[in-house]
Amino acid sequence: MKFGYTIIYVPDVAASLSFFEQAFGFARRFLHESQTYGELDTGETTLAFAAHELADANFGGGHVAASASAEPLGMEVAFVTDDVAAAHARALAAGATEMSAPVSKPWGQVVSYVRCPDGTLVELCTPVHG
């Protein structure tokens, strides 16, 4: 088995794709003509976005929308970069909300957190060397 992709359910798939392209520099793989599903090429693993209506169709009991939660959900997407400060500034300039400015952790990693307009929590971090 291998990890295939991550799907984030969002209110506006096209808007999320555009934000992630602008904020993090990922390339759009495609946006379905229905505007309810799209993917970004992140290098190793596909990052996909799907409309809340698809989540409603997939999960009969409903789901918690990250965009509707005042606090971030208990999961994050992490992007590894050599320059966390620059990536953090780029994300903020694109419209992200700062959750935590870049900080050096005791194990030597630099980490920051932003929340995207669609509610997604993103960690920006340097590689872990161990």
Which stretches of residues belong to each language-model region?
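Short glycine-/small-residue motifs
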Residues: 121-124
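Conserved beta-strand-loop-alpha-helix junction that forms the acyl-donor binding cleft
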Residues: 10-12, 106
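Conserved active-site tyrosine of GNAT-family acetyltransferases
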Residues: 16-21, 91, 119
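Helix N-cap motif at beta-to-alpha junctions
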Residues: 12-13, 82-84
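Vicinal oxygen chelate
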Residues: 1-5, 27-80, 86-115, 126-130
